[in-house]
Curated annotation (Swiss-Prot):
Protein name: Expansin-B1
Primary localisation category: secreted
Organism of derivation: Zea mays (Maize)
Gene coding for it: EXPB1
Similarity section: Belongs to the expansin family. Expansin B subfamily.
Stored CDD domains: DPBB_EXPB_N (cd22275)
Signal sequence coordinates: 1-24
């Protein structure tokens, strides 16, 4: 009887542990507070992983949850990352820039590398989690140890938000998404300097002096749905996270078309 009682107690303890833990595997860590534009230079702690090809830009289509394509090419050049909830911020963190460094592993150089947020991750392994492209993760290493550091898998790192910098002359670019028409306009914004991310996009068409707010559709794509057909050219007014504004006057021409790219003559500098 004593043996049976002990067995019952053991089974009960196991069941209680399973209920308390919810599931097997590492415990889920709640996300930290949202990262803002407080450029105070303070380093915070995070965990870093990597995905995609060892020397690639992360996502297999060289894109990601921000909707930006060809992030393997300049000016992103594959130095990209998925941010977790307080970094990605449901798309409003798209385009923001961070310095990341590692110091604990012998392979770490200790020197910061700058990454652009172009994708998201929801893996609850730390309050702040960067899932870096293979190229960016390898760049944390001392010379010649890029492949070796990628074998670390998960790594403790330090990070801080920094102002985004682009090559001289790089202006803000708008991409009209496929499937758009005069009653539905979806616009991707990229190559935004300074804060890097946008909290408000407004549009002004030829028929009105009014600035109409667009809705954040997903990632870095903003949209306008209207019963009354829009008529170009369109001007776009952008507001960055720190409250700065720029106006791209008549950046989208009257004869605009879906899946077309239009380069403005403005930038946040």
């Amino acid at each position: 009887m004593g043996s049976l009682a002990n067995n019952i107690m053991v089974v009960g303890a196991v069941l209680a542990a399973l209920v308390a833990g919810g599931s097997c595997g590492p415990p889920k860590v709640p996300p930290g507070p949202n990262i803002t534009t407080n450029y105070n230079g303070k380093w915070l702690t995070a965990r870093a992983t990597w995905y995609g090809q060892p020397n690639g830009a992360g996502a297999p289509d060289n894109g990601g949850a921000c909707g930006i394509k060809n992030v393997n090419l300049p000016p992103y050049s594959g130095m990209t990352a998925c941010g977790n909830v307080p970094i990605f911020k449901d798309g409003k963190g798209c385009g923001s820039c961070y310095e990341v460094r590692c110091k604990e592993k012998p392979e770490c150089s200790g020197n910061p590398v700058t990454v652009y947020i172009t994708d998201m991750n929801y893996e609850p392994i730390a309050p702040y989690h960067f899932d870096l492209s293979g190229k960016a993760f390898g760049s944390l290493a001392k010379p010649g140890l890029n492949d070796k550091i990628r074998h670390c898998g998960i790594m403790d790192v330090e990070f801080r938000r920094v102002r985004c910098k682009y090559p001289a002359g790089q202006k803000i670019v708008f991409h009209i998404e496929k499937g758009c028409n005069p009653n539905y306009l979806a616009v991707l914004v990229k190559y935004v300097a300074d804060d890097g991310d946008i909290v408000l996009m407004e549009i002004q068409d030829k028929l009105s002096a009014e600035w109409k707010p667009m809705k954040l559709s997903w990632g870095a794509i903003w949209r306008m749905d209207t019963a009354k057909a829009l008529k170009g050219p369109f001007s776009i007014r952008l507001t960055s996270e720190s409250g700065k504004k720029v106006i791209a006057k008549d950046v989208i021409p009257a004869n605009w078309r879906p899946d077309a790219v239009y380069t403005s003559n403005v930038q946040f500098y």
